[in-house]
Amino acid sequence: MRLNQNTLLLGKKVVLVPYTSEHVPSRYHEWMKSEELQRLTASEPLTLEQEYAMQCSWQEDADKCTFIVLDAEKWQAQPGATEESCMVGDVNLFLTDLEDLTLGEIEVMIAEPSCRGKGLGTEAVLAMLSYGVTTLGLTKFEAKIGQGNEPSIRMFQKLHFEQVATSSVFQEVTLRLTVSESEHQWLLEQTSHVEEKPYRDGSAEPC
């Protein structure tokens, strides 16, 4: 999505930066070779060329908003640290319901095993929810999660998502959050520390 190409979201535990071609060959392509991550994200293995093509497509598509998740502690503690060395996962919003433009499907992946269970995924999701509401005008969110991914299901439930459907065919559950006035206020409180900053010079490389 072009809209977030000049946006950096700085939290306490994570930094969210736009997904660029620079992120593909380092960690991202290696992550997606993992059979565990393929299973958890319902993804197919891609060649490096296919990963580049997908990144370019997602950068241009108006219905996909992607941020790479960086470890904020590492990113801030090491002057000159590259984004690639601080990458731990990604967080996505898909705006694919043409009948309801206020609905977004949210996904998060903390790919680095050593970074799981530390609240990085939670803060990444909260920051993305806030961005979706304030910048994209969304008022409803869905998360589709594999039935066996209990940690992810519990995390979304702690963020006020409620289970609304189960698919035995796809072996996944669908959770939903409707952002009422009270939920919006809660979300603002949870993300009051998150700062939105310009990302680099705001220019994205042409595909």
Swiss-Prot record:
UniProt GO cellular component terms: protein-containing complex
Alphabetical keyword list: Acyltransferase, Transferase
Similarity field: Belongs to the acetyltransferase family. GNAT subfamily.
PANTHER family with a match to the protein in the record: ALPHA_BETA-TUBULIN-N-ACETYLTRANSFERASE 9 (PTHR13256:SF16), N-ACETYLTRANSFERASE 9 (PTHR13256)
GO MF term set: tubulin N-terminal-methionine acetyltransferase activity
A Pfam family assignment: Acetyltransf_3
Listed EC numbers: 2.3.1.308
Top EC class for this record: transferase
Function: N-acetyltransferase that mediates the acetylation of the N-terminal residues of alpha- and beta-tubulin.
Domain N-acetyltransferase intervals: 35-180
Keyword ATP-binding: no
Gene name as annotated: NAT9
Annotated source species: Homo sapiens
Catalyzed reactions: N-terminal L-methionyl-[tubulin] + acetyl-CoA = N-terminal N(alpha)-acetyl-L-methionyl-[tubulin] + CoA + H(+)
Stated name of the protein: Alpha/beta-tubulin-N-acetyltransferase 9
